[in-house]
Amino acid sequence: MHMGTTEIFLIAMLIIFSVPYLIWRFGNTDYYAPLVVVQIITGILLGPGIMGRAYPEYYSFVFNPQVVQSLNGIAWWAVMIFVMIAGIELDLKKAWEHRRESTITAGLALGTPLVFGCVAALGLVGYAGWMGPKAQSWQFVLGIGMACAVTALPILILLMEKLEILRQPIGQRILRYASLDDIAIWGVLAVILLDWDRVGRQLGFLVVFAVATRLFRMMMVRLQERDRWYISFIWLAACAFAADWAGLHFMVGAFLAGAVMDADWFNQEKMDFLRANVLMAIMPVFFLSTGLRTNWAMGGSAVFIVAAVLLIASVSGKLAGIHLAGKILKWGPGEASIIGWLLQTKALIMIIFVNILLDKQIITSETFTALLLMAIGSTMLTVPMVYPKLQRVAQLIFKTS
């Protein structure tokens, strides 16, 4: 029976939404693997390295080029909205109010795993197949280091909601640290993506963006909230287009679009509702499209070994940095461990970053696969490590600094 592209596309959508949900719901995985993690894992399982190898005819039928192109369009828009929300949710005002504590903690939480990750990446430079064809060594090393250092702010919010600490003082402290790290990480990414052949365009983009931002902010404060929501999506599309045209990548533009908006322009409950619905309704398509980019050509064992090394570098670096910050700031027993395990959450933001590195051919699809596995492992460790610690030191939940 012949099927058109629309019918095959809908089969793909049926798979994307049903398979991970059924695994999550009936497998009762929520403690170790929230639905978002199950969706990412399912994306990998449905990719060319696993399903494509086991059932090549079915794989090529469902995920043919026309269907993949349609899925990619949805995935691009989904991730742009998600990244914009992450930018809006940066809490830099609170970070400034507690600037000594926030700067020390965020600096060590970022710098230590960045160094550990760069050291691990230096070990990969000498082996063929890990560094992308358009990467210089420093870009590859810094990109891997950045991936090991990043904290996934939006997923961190979801996990802290699950642990019932998001609106508590410790949750707000952790958001301050993560917000500063987010800004720094996107700055590092911009340096990595600097294209000397298009540096004029990139500088032009930054100048025009600065002027446009001033005008945009002047307009937004004069609008009613209902208009702000709609205008924010127009602004998102414009910023993403301009950044991509300049060679920085559309996701950098999406983050900048959100970062220059104030969270108090929008109702917090509506913002939470938007984030939850983007995650439920369209982000699963991004997870699938991410899984379709995985590659096991180096051999499964090599990819898993590299993923394990990067996971160790990431987690140990984050915990070491936070414990050092705790000693400097004289935190109580157990405090650094809880904060460190929460801040090492990778999930979506790291996956978004490594998608950008893959797009720019700074890493290969094998490295991308290893980093994806590292992000999954990192996120699955978070709740099982933090929940028992919170039960033992419940008084920390209410500590403000």
Residue ranges and their predicted role:
Residues 2-15, 66-83, 134-151, 197-211, ...:
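Structural signature of hydrophobic alpha-helical transmembrane segments
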Residues 3-11, 169-177, 217-228, 271-278, ...:
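Short, amphipathic, aromatic/basic-enriched membrane-interface segments that mark the entry/exit
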Residues 12, 16, 35-44, 101-110, ...:
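Alpha-helical transmembrane segments of multi-pass membrane proteins, especially transporters
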Residues 12, 16-25, 44, 48, ...:
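Transmembrane alpha-helical segments of multi-pass membrane transport proteins and ion-pumping complexes
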Residues 22-30, 52, 92-163, 290-394:
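Transmembrane alpha-helices that form the ion-translocation and gating core
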Residues 31, 45-101, 219-309:
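Membrane-interface junctions of multi-pass transporters
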Residues 39-51, 104-119, 176-189, 229-243, ...:
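Small-residue-rich segments of transmembrane alpha-helices in multi-pass membrane proteins
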Residues 129-141, 156-184, 192, 200:
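Membrane-interface helix-loop-helix junctions at boundaries between adjacent transmembrane segments
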